[in-house]
Each structure stands twice: as C-alpha cells, then as structure tokens.
Amino acid sequence: MAIARGDKVRILRPESYWFNEVGTVASVDQSGIKYPVVVRFEKVNYNGFSGSDGGVNTNNFAEAELQVVAAAAKK
C-alpha cells in the first residue's frame, strides 16, 4: 500500500527524534529523492532557542521507515 497525503504514520527510524511517534503525511515527492515523504508532528523537537517555543515539527522519511496507522479519508 502506497503512503498518501493525510495518512497517519508511525516512525520506524530508530535514530529519529520522533521514533515510534505518530505523525501526519504532509506530502509525498515523486521525483525519486531518497527521503520523499514529509511528515508533520504535533510537538516540536529540541532545535528551538533557549526560552522559546521554536523548533521543527516536520521531517523527511523514506517509505520503508514508515508504518501506516490510519489511512486518509477518501474524497
């Protein structure tokens, strides 16, 4: 099953900050790049400045590093 925009996915990459977390697929690139799936998360990572709420809440993954938890609703 191909991963599509809007799917809820679990992260299987052990070295990722979001390992075993669930995020939403924001986009899937079809150009053949190594990490084509952009996943958006609710929480941010540790890249913010001290005392700020900043940080990153998206990351790119390969399809093999993701497990679909819930498919996006069909239109």
UniProtKB/Swiss-Prot annotation:
One of the GO BP terms on file: photosynthesis
Keywords: Membrane, Photosynthesis, Photosystem I, Thylakoid
Highest taxon in the source lineage: Bacteria
Chief location: membrane
Record's bilayer topology term: Peripheral membrane protein
InterPro entries hit by this protein: Elect_transpt_acc-like_dom_sf, PSI_PsaE
GO cellular component: photosystem I reaction center; plasma membrane-derived thylakoid membrane
Database matches in Gene3D superfamilies: 2.30.30.50
Pfam families: PSI_PsaE
Subcellular location: Cellular thylakoid membrane
Nuclease listed as a keyword: no
Family of this protein: Belongs to the PsaE family.
Role description: Stabilizes the interaction between PsaC and the PSI core, assists the docking of the ferredoxin to PSI and interacts with ferredoxin-NADP oxidoreductase.
Entry protein name: Photosystem I reaction center subunit IV
Organism expressing this protein natively: Synechococcus sp. (strain ATCC 27144 / PCC 6301 / SAUG 1402/1)
